């Protein structure tokens, strides 16, 4: 994977704060009630990162609020199977340095228990070491699901479970928990 999208209470304030740290914006989308800033991957250690806001959703932590990129009818496609997106895992040859960089860029201190984890208000970003010279990438998404056994059964039927037992779609590992 190549991109992490985060929601904020005030995307324009976050844009100003992050660019004030020397990070370049590669795209801004300010359309109606929606604000988004895509930051240069090189400035985020190799991952395209976007900080977005949907102004018509008064509480950005509300999981079923408006979200313009998903279209007006996204709720109709929602399923009761997935309860939450719990974490994103980024693989990096220098995971400690990248975790520290992201902590600065996001204004989020690392977990006291694990400096490779950045706790967010609704989930976390995890950093895992990769082999020297390996590219930085989004390696995994952790989903909290209603029935992990059923999700695994469907993944097997869809042929997206590898020989290592991991569910992978588009090169990204999907970790599931109940």
Label for each model-derived stretch:
Residues 96, 100-142, 146, 152:
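Intrinsically disordered, low-complexity segments enriched in Gly and acidic/Ser/Thr residues
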Residues 2, 71, 82, 102-105, ...:
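Aromatic-residue detector
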Residues 5-9, 18-22, 55-59, 87, ...:
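A generic short-segment signal for beta-strand/edge and adjacent turn/coil regions
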Residues 1-93, 121-126, 132-178, ...:
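Vicinal oxygen chelate
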Residues 71-114:
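Surface-exposed interaction/gating patches
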Residues 1, 11-14, 19, 74-78, ...:
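Aromatic-enriched hydrophobic runs in primary sequence
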């Amino acid at each position: 994977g190549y991109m992490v999208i985060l929601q904020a209470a005030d995307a324009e304030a976050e844009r100003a704060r992050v660019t004030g740290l020397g990070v370049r914006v590669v795209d801004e989308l300010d359309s109606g009630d929606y604000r988004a800033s895509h930051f240069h991957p090189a400035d985020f250690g190799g991952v395209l990162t976007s900080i977005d806001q949907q102004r018509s959703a008064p509480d950005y932590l509300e999981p079923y609020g408006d979200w313009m990129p998903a279209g007006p009818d996204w709720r109709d496609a929602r399923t009761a199977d997935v309860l939450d997106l719990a974490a994103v895992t980024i693989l990096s040859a220098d995971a400690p340095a990248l975790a520290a960089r992201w902590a600065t860029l996001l204004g989020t201190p690392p977990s006291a228990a694990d400096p490779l984890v950045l706790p967010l208000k609704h989930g976390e970003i995890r950093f895992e070491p990769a082999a020297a010279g390996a590219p930085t990438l989004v390696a995994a998404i952790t989903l909290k699901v209603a029935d992990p056994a059923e999700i695994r059964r469907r993944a097997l039927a869809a042929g997206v479970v590898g020989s290592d037992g991991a569910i992978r779609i588009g090169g990204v590992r999907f970790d599931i928990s109940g």
